[in-house]
Amino acid sequence: MELLEEDLTCPICCSLFDDPRVLPCSHNFCKKCLEGLLEGNVRNSLWRPSPFKCPTCRKETSATGVNSLQVNYSLKGIVEKYNKIKISPKMPVCKGHLGQPLNIFCVTDMQLICGICATRGEHTKHVFSSIEDAYAREKNAFESLFQSFETWRRGDALSRLDTLETNKRKALQLLTKDSDKVKEFFEKLQHTLDQKKNEILSDFETMKLAVMQTYDPEINKINTILQEQRMAFNIAEAFKDVSEPIIFLQQMQEFREKIKVIKETPLPHSNLPTSPLMKNFDTSQWGDIKLVDVDKLSLPQDTGVFTSKIPWYPYLLLMMVVLLGLLIFFGPTVFLEWSPLDELATWKDYLSSFNSYLTKSADFIEQSVFYWEQMTDGFFIFGERVKNVSLVALNNVAEFICKYKLL
């Protein structure tokens, strides 16, 4: 077909011939193509038209118009038949015999075959039919076959489809429910881990606070003593070159009193009586903890609070001093008749006695203050521990209530 199409193609427009005209040299061209060539030849000639030459062989022709050329009816008919063949569908060929058209219908096997299949193949003893007769019979058979196929097990198929979709939906719901359980489990586990981490870190912060409350007062006392010492040196530097006797003696007296006070001020102990914070603390020991026992993680039992080794009797002495002061202030009001002048005089005497007593007992008071600070620090740490234990207990109770839906 491709070779035939080349012979039916116009050399000028490269399309199939349309109303082909033949030149005296026997070459064929489309009528419209020749008209275009002749018009161009006339426009390019100023005085007299030049002879028309064949586009293929360049042979001159005496034709002055396309209408004077002969129509090639044979070629025109061939082109028309070629167009019809090209438009019509191609006949299928046999797969077993290359190039042989399937132009016979085997009634026995109900299929198209070629001539070789009918004469020398497996269909030799079968019943054959023409394509037209087979088409008429199969066209009628198609209607009944289509109707029976349309209702073939349709109800059963729809029922099974509905069952499969229902089972699929239930399976997805179960998987979603299980995945939600897994998500909830890990969310609770993460919450427990975060809670336990915050609890242990809170214990560390409490211990840090205890360290600062134990050491900071002593450090501040030493810094105060050093500052007083620097001030005394500054005073000495200021008056050591004074030549006025009175001023020098006055400054010397103040300097001597300052040095006396500094020397009489006791220095705090550098090694405070506290127990170690932790013994053999190692987080690698937590590697063997199971997930179910995560809530049981805790710091070693010998940690968390400074254990003071201060004896109990200084606290007793301090309490006695406090009670004595309360008795001095409030005793006359409670047990004696109230008189403004006598009351003021009595208060003055008591305060004078108490002031002299305190002046003579400076060391005792400083020791009492030291022990009092230790006692308040201990109460503060104890209160923090009680608060932490209470919060943990409340959280456990809340989780127990939520878990078993008691409310």
Curated annotation (Swiss-Prot):
Record PROSITE patterns: ZF_BBOX, ZF_RING_1, ZF_RING_2
Zinc finger (B box-type): 89-131
Modifications the protein undergoes after translation, according to the UniProt entry: Auto-ubiquitinated; requires the RING-type zinc finger. Auto-polyubiquitination leads to proteasomal degradation.
Pathway in which this enzyme or protein is active: Protein modification; protein ubiquitination
Coiled coil ranges: 172-200
GO cellular component: cytoplasm; endoplasmic reticulum membrane; perinuclear endoplasmic reticulum
SUPFAM superfamilies: B-box zinc-binding domain, RING/U-box
Membrane-traversing stretches: 316-336
Domain of life where this protein originates: Eukaryota
A GO molecular-function descriptor: zinc ion binding
Keywords: Coiled coil, Endoplasmic reticulum, Immunity, Innate immunity, Membrane, Metal-binding, Transferase, Transmembrane, Transmembrane helix, Ubl conjugation, Ubl conjugation pathway, Zinc, Zinc-finger
Chief subcellular location: endoplasmic reticulum
Binding site for Zn(2+): C94, H97, C117, H123
Catalytic activity, reaction form: S-ubiquitinyl-[E2 ubiquitin-conjugating enzyme]-L-cysteine + [acceptor protein]-L-lysine = [E2 ubiquitin-conjugating enzyme]-L-cysteine + N(6)-ubiquitinyl-[acceptor protein]-L-lysine
E.C. number: 2.3.2.27
Cell compartments where the protein resides: Endoplasmic reticulum membrane
GO BP term, example: positive regulation of canonical NF-kappaB signal transduction
Membrane topology (UniProt): Single-pass membrane protein
Residue intervals of every RING-type zinc finger in the record: 10-58
Domain notes: The coiled-coil domain is required for the induction of autophagy during endoplasmic reticulum (ER) stress.
Subunit structure comment from the entry: Interacts (via C-terminal domain) with VCP. Interacts with AKT1; the interaction ubiquitinates AKT1 and leads to its proteasomal degradation. Interacts with MDM2; the interaction ubiquitinates AKT1 and leads to its proteasomal degradation. Interacts with p62/SQSTM1. Interacts with TRAF6. Interacts with IKBKG/NEMO.
Job of this protein: Endoplasmic reticulum (ER) membrane anchored E3 ligase involved in the retrotranslocation and turnover of membrane and secretory proteins from the ER through a set of processes named ER-associated degradation (ERAD). This process acts on misfolded proteins as well as in the regulated degradation of correctly folded proteins. Enhances ionizing radiation-induced p53/TP53 stability and apoptosis via ubiquitinating MDM2 and AKT1 and decreasing AKT1 kinase activity through MDM2 and AKT1 proteasomal degradation. Regulates ER stress-induced autophagy, and may act as a tumor suppressor.
Homology family: Belongs to the TRIM/RBCC family.
Protein name, per record: E3 ubiquitin-protein ligase TRIM13
